[in-house]
């Protein structure tokens, strides 16, 4: 993703050991007009757009993953017929035209040590996806073994954050045994060399305690992290920075 743009459709990441190649498969948004579910479409390969992934070519990876963030213009009436709420959509700059996700669902298959162990990650793009794709809330989320609710550390828990939590996530723990976590990303914005490490740790602990109280979960299940600094640490092979990012806790 890039500034101002993130994944626009639910995206699954996993490793299918019988597949000879890595790939991204994309289900066009127009399939929402059909009565078939995403699970049913998974059994019909011809409806999916297949993009090969070359893990040795960074430019290829960037171009391929950029597809997951794509949008397309559509008349607002057509968007409503597809189940979108117009107030949740971005204007295309023309009267009665809005931007909708180009894809309904994305599947990413590639080899990774964690994915080889059977881990399957489902990334959802936020409230609009949860509210307009019933299969997410009725099937996919309830079948998860753990849900990690990603929040920014440089803002509080917003009203829209609480709406997602209360309407779609909190009750999952009541229906099935499931682990609920909150990851507070961007803790590096709190890093302040002038104030000292004690001040920084106090600020991070306050965020953990406040978040746990607001969401009604254990403080131990609130994980402060910096994904950006963890990535930089991996690239630079900086073990101290990686430890400070706290990604290992996650």
Per-segment meaning from a language model:
Residues 1-250:
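Globular "head" domains of long coiled-coil molecular machines
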């Amino acid at each position: 993703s890039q500034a101002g743009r993130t994944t626009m459709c639910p995206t699954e990441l996993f490793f299918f050991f019988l597949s000879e190649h890595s790939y991204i498969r994309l289900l066009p948004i127009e399939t929402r007009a059909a009565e078939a579910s995403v699970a049913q479409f998974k059994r019909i390969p011809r409806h999916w757009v297949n993009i090969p992934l070359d893990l040795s070519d960074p430019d290829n990876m960037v171009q391929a993953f950029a597809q997951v963030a794509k949008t397309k213009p559509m008349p607002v009436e057509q968007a409503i017929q597809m189940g979108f709420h117009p107030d949740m959509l971005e204007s295309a700059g023309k009267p009665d035209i809005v931007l909708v996700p180009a894809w309904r669902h994305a599947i990413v298959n590639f080899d990774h040590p964690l994915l080889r162990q059977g881990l399957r990650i489902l990334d959802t793009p936020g409230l609009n996806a949860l509210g307009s794709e019933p299969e997410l809330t009725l099937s996919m989320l309830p079948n998860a073994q753990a849900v990690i609710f990603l929040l920014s550390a440089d803002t509080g828990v917003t009203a829209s954050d609480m709406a997602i939590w209360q309407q779609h996530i909190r009750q999952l723990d009541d229906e099935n045994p499931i682990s609920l976590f909150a990851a507070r990303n961007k803790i590096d914005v709190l890093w302040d060399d002038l104030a000292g490490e004690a001040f920084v740790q106090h600020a991070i602990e306050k965020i953990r305690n406040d978040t746990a109280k607001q969401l009604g979960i254990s403080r131990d299940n609130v994980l402060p992290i910096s994904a950006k600094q963890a990535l930089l640490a991996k690239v630079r092979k900086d073990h101290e920075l990686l430890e400070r990012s706290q990604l290992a806790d996650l």
